[in-house]
């Protein structure tokens, strides 16, 4: 994710005020907002010092309650208290009803089949509910940072489809907030640990949240995160640990027929017990019944481990499957990043370490790591220059192009073009019967490939064996909002294509860019001269090759004297082309062209004569 903010050579990077931007982890269970301040990245607390906001929204006749206040009423008013709305994002009502889980809400259906929650304030959709969760986070950020936000980065699960991603953007749009980027949660976690600027290799993101488990296997290559495989269980999370504890308590206390209020009370106590056992060998569980009876029991860590062992084992099985899908082994995994509050459970950390063979990264609060990564990315994208190697690129700092015959650079995307951008150009074959074409993608402002930065090489095969110049290959350069360049070459008649991805900004510093730009200005006149020479040399080679083929086929159309003159001129062109006088090469080519015009006319006449031989006027 390394991006670049550049200035013209000789100028300082334009000084500007620190722009305000935040990263938001819009979670299933809890949501957080984080920002970079004075070079330090941290989540922002509310007035009570709470960093996480429960992702819960309650609708009453007069108000909308969000977070802890809504959570207090969830047991008494479950029908109007919407929890885990993220699970409804981008899903149809039919999908929700077809699932195994039942919900206490009253649903209606929108015209396009999406779910609507029926509340005392009317029907609301998941996007509107999500906007209510975002609202206090945005307000908290603006109050803490002391100004209006220029934009936000919101994290989403890697498996979110287009509809779910668009729904997340729409939620922010309802509040008038600019979304700088939607960032995959695994990538955000990796960024938080600075893994995007470290060695290349495979990274595992083990994300055990309240309601879901996700395992993502990423490959970091030249600053680009590639998702190799994802897996997990959308119905397995810390909540399941709580339910097992609740069932254990009910069994010990011999509680059978319980109402929804007692059930919610037991669940809240189960969560507290789970959290206490993170650091303690045992803890006391306590519940007060409606008649005032106080129930207590001691729950040990060993008992809790036994309860959840099967579920933790299930997550490890998912890790094993996902690694197999990715085609990598545990030995190839450089780091394992722990995400989600449930990864605090000691048994989880022990099992993950045992499986991957190395201690997982846990130094950043697993509840906050995704928001922190999003904040780092937001600070980059909004235009701030943090004290790190991560710099902003919202324009192309150096032109992107392709090598053509003679070692010349054909620029496809010019520098200072804003991104995202797509540009296409057509190229053709140089030789008769050419069935493949090698592409060399370069970066820089100079005219010759030797003076530019090599980015990538790839080959297009399967080009029809046509005459030189007859095949048409369309080359498309596409740079996305993350600065990732995709180059695709397609032969138009067959549709055969090949492509490659590369990060143009990877490994480039401001100084290197400035040097490359200064060199392009310093050597501009020389470069143009060298380009003109190379172009004439390529043209000379093309003309000579074409003429050699024509003479081999139709040389009998010339008498000995004519053939001798043409051969002599061809030798002269070859000799002049070996020199460094572009004008002389051009004149030699023009002389050869004049000398062979009569030969070209005879070839045309002969071709027509052969084509029409034996045919009558009526058949033509």
Curated annotation (Swiss-Prot):
It comes from the Bacteria. One of its GO terms (molecular function) is ATP binding. Pfam families: HSP70. Keywords: ATP-binding, Chaperone, Nucleotide-binding. The keyword ATP-binding applies. GO terms for biological process: iron-sulfur cluster assembly. InterPro entries: ATPase_NBD (IPR043129), Heat_shock_70_CS (IPR018181), HSP70_C_sf (IPR029048), HSP70_peptide-bd_sf (IPR029047), Hsp_70_fam (IPR013126), ISC_FeS_clus_asmbl_HscA (IPR010236). NCBIfam families: HscA, PRK05183.1. Belongs to the heat shock protein 70 family. Chaperone involved in the maturation of iron-sulfur cluster-containing proteins. Has a low intrinsic ATPase activity which is markedly stimulated by HscB. This is Chaperone protein HscA homolog. It comes from Shewanella baltica (strain OS155 / ATCC BAA-1091). The lineage of its organism: Bacteria, Pseudomonadati, Pseudomonadota, Gammaproteobacteria, Alteromonadales.
